[in-house]
Design a protein with these regions (language model features):
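ABC ATP-binding cassette signature C-motif
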Residues: 1-171
Length: 171
């Protein structure tokens, strides 16, 4: 059985002011695909991901998404309400008995934070370092049941152990 097509971009263009950031970009993303977008700073990689995620609309062209495709994006800016706890950001309204016994969630937290202790879930977003904020964003995406995960500079602020864990987890 062929992989399910998740999203298509056809002749997508976007400009900011007088400068074209994307010019007639066409691509398709299928379930199970792993791709990298490379280019120099300011070349439009982040903008392309925002269009794929539906966060930004192109000036021209068409974006077609599978109706059931669940898409998440980790942008370059790690943001959450400063008073939100790690548990609020990552787990949302899930009941503790639902997530605490889930081996996948335990593995993600242990891999990204080194443990699965309650104190991690109680820390506020404002109290976290840059690397910890990045780990929170990654944990949220990896725990959510998504079909497509877009990672924009995912290793920014991560230490060597975090980069190694993420690389092995995404295989």
């Amino acid at each position: 059985m062929a992989p399910r097509n998740l999203i298509n971009l056809e002749n997508v263009s976007l400009s900011y002011g007088k400068g074209a950031v994307l010019d007639q970009v066409s691509l398709g993303l299928a379930e199970g695909a792993r791709i990298g977008i490379v280019g120099r700073n300011g070349a439009g990689k982040s903008t392309l991901m925002k269009i794929i995620a539906g966060v930004e609309d192109p000036d021209e062209g068409r974006v077609t998404k599978s109706n059931s495709a669940r898409i998440g994006i980790l942008s370059q800016i790690d943001s959450a309400a400063p008073q939100s706890t790690v548990g609020d950001v990552v787990l949302g309204n899930r009941e503790k008995h639902d997530w605490a016994s889930d081996p996948r969630i335990r593995e993600i937290f242990t891999g990204l934070f080194g443990s699965f202790d309650d104190h991690i879930f109680e820390r506020t977003f404002a109290s976290l370092s840059g690397g910890e904020k990045r780990r929170v964003g990654l944990a949220k995406l990896l725990i959510d049941d998504l079909d497509l995960i877009l990672l924009d500079e995912p290793t920014n602020h991560l230490d060597v152990e975090g980069v190694a864990w993420l690389a092995s987890h995404l295989k």
